[in-house]
């Protein structure tokens, strides 16, 4: 009997499931956190009545299909079935708004993080709290509904996020992991709970409306990584596994957000570490030693799954424009009768960029495929410009587009690292930009003027990170922190391939962004 089969049959495997934007993915891991099976379900949000949403049917059909595909993978690989698990954890896209009445009925369609319909509320709360409240945060959605006089608000008994909703329906527990909760409402780093001063301010703000609830009564309870968060109910087991093989009573860990699972999957939960996820969009998260001195609209304040404060820079645009140009070069090659392999094409063009001038020789790219809040743009218009005396070469062209993919991120990071003087020992890079060895990594190191590590074992991303958080709950030693557990038992001291910033690259990127 294989070790993995034995792990599954003895109920020692741990399951992580993440509801991402394009897909729901499940990862099953063994006692040492190694993935042994997976399943996925593709889904798409829809725009209905001007709201980006997923229906409840989308959510439950997606979950059961995803779990069913995981069960098929287990059957195919190990010729066995899952009847019990050591632990389960759910994560999802953070923020958004799911409001329920006293009977557990959804009051209005799920409003996802993608909606930019809460500008008035976000601005008012940011001013009231002296704390940046982005439009996608749950509290901004609630306050906007209040400002708009929406009838359902008086009937709210509970509101939560997507991961919180799934967890509630499977366990009966109205809880959230602190990282996920930090995208609903600001967290007090000392108490690892909602900021009571801000809750009091909110209650005072809406008191004239006469609603029958106080804010804390309708928010999920906050838990930190490692705490018990309920067990799978008999009804929950049926919702998850249509085959009926899965038994009730399995412990669940606190549901987390996709930011927290990304931190776990890259082993960047410790103070002075961070990670950058760079693909279609890009975001950077840095775990802080102390609170920032000022409020910055470019920076979101969230937490690690353990409740340490994290500053996040989120940009809508990263590689889309770059990918479009690579597609054009593919057409050029095909016009000459060549059939280029896309991985080879990307690799060749990315490596070519290393031959370019450090400041891109007078070439400048703006990669705004869509609107960009960090730079105040409502719509995207990708642009490429050059000075008449520019050094117009393929190397500089590629380098300028690679710089552009991280330039907006650099604007936010400069506020963090230069204005706020935040110290970072190491950043972990993951995502498509880092596939070509040493290129995207070196450019990020230049943008941040800090060492950047890329793990060989990027693992399975978010759902793997969620499985690790569930594993931590059941496998942690007495007094063992999440940071100690991940570093010692999962990553085993692996720090990945590290690139130090090249001073000439740092200076070149500075010159480029000032243009």
Where are these regions (language model features)?
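Phosphate/pyrophosphate-binding loops at sites that engage ATP/ADP/AMP, CoA/4′-phosphopantetheine
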Residues: 63-85, 149-153, 196-215, 240-244, ...
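Glycine/Thr-rich phosphate-binding loops that ligate phosphate moieties of nucleotide
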Residues: 2-41, 45-47, 57, 64-65, ...
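Residue-level preference for well-ordered alpha-helical positions
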Residues: 126, 167-168, 199-203, 237-241, ...
């Amino acid at each position: 009997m294989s070790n993995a089969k034995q792990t599954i049959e003895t109920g020692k495997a741990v399951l992580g499931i993440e509801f991402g934007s394009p897909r729901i993915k499940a990862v099953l891991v063994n006692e040492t956190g190694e993935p042994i099976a997976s399943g996925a379900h593709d889904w798409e949000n829809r725009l209905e009545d001007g709201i980006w949403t997923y229906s409840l049917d989308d959510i439950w059909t997606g979950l059961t299909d995803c779990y069913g595909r995981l069960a098929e993978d287990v059957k195919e690989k190990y010729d066995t079935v899952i009847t019990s698990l050591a632990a389960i954890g759910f994560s999802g896209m953070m923020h958004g708004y799911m409001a329920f009445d006293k009977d557990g009925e959804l009051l209005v369609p799920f409003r996802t993080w993608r909606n930019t319909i809460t500008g008035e509320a976000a601005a008012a709360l940011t001013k009231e709290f002296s704390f940046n409240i982005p439009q996608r945060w749950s509290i901004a959605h609630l306050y906007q509904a209040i400002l708009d006089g929406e009838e359902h608000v008086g009937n709210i008994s509970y509101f939560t996020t997507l991961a919180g909703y799934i967890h509630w329906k499977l366990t009966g527990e109205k809880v959230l992991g602190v990282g996920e909760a930090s995208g609903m409402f600001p967290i007090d780093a000392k108490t690892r709970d909602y900021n009571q001063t801000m809750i009091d301010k909110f209650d005072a703000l809406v008191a004239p409306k006469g609603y029958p609830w106080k804010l804390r009564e309708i928010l999920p309870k906050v838990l930190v990584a490692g705490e018990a968060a309920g067990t799978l109910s008999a009804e929950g087991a049926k919702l998850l596994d249509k085959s009926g093989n899965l038994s009730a009573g399995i412990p669940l860990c606190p549901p987390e957000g996709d930011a927290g699972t990304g931190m776990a999957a890259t082993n960047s939960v410790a103070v002075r570490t961070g990670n950058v996820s760079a693909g279609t969009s890009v975001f950077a998260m840095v775990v802080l030693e102390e609170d920032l001195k000022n409020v910055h609209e470019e920076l979101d304040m969230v937490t690690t799954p353990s409740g340490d404060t994290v500053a996040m820079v989120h940009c809508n645009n990263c590689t889309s424009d770059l990918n479009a140009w690579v597609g054009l070069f593919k057409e050029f090659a095909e016009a000459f009768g060549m059939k280029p392999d896309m991985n080879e094409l990307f690799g060749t063009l990315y490596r070519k960029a290393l031959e370019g001038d450090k400041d891109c020789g007078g070439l400048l790219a703006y990669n705004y495929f869509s609107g960009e809040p960090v730079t105040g743009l409502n719509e995207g218009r990708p642009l490429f410009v050059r000075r008449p005396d520019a050094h117009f070469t393929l190397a500089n062209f590629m380098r300028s587009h690679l710089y552009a993919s991280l330039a907006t991120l650099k604007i936010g990071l400069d506020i963090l690292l230069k204005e706020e003087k935040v110290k970072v020992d190491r950043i972990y890079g993951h995502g498509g930009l880092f596939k070509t060895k040493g290129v995207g990594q070196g450019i990020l190191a230049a943008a941040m003027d800090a060492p950047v590590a890329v793990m060989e074992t990027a693992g399975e991303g978010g759902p793997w990170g969620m499985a690790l958080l569930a594993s931590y709950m059941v496998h942690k030693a007495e007094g063992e922190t999440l940071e100690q557990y991940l570093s010692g038992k999962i990553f085993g001291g692996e720090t990945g391939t590290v690139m130090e910033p090249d001073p000439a690259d740092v200076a070149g990127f500075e010159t480029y962004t000032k243009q």
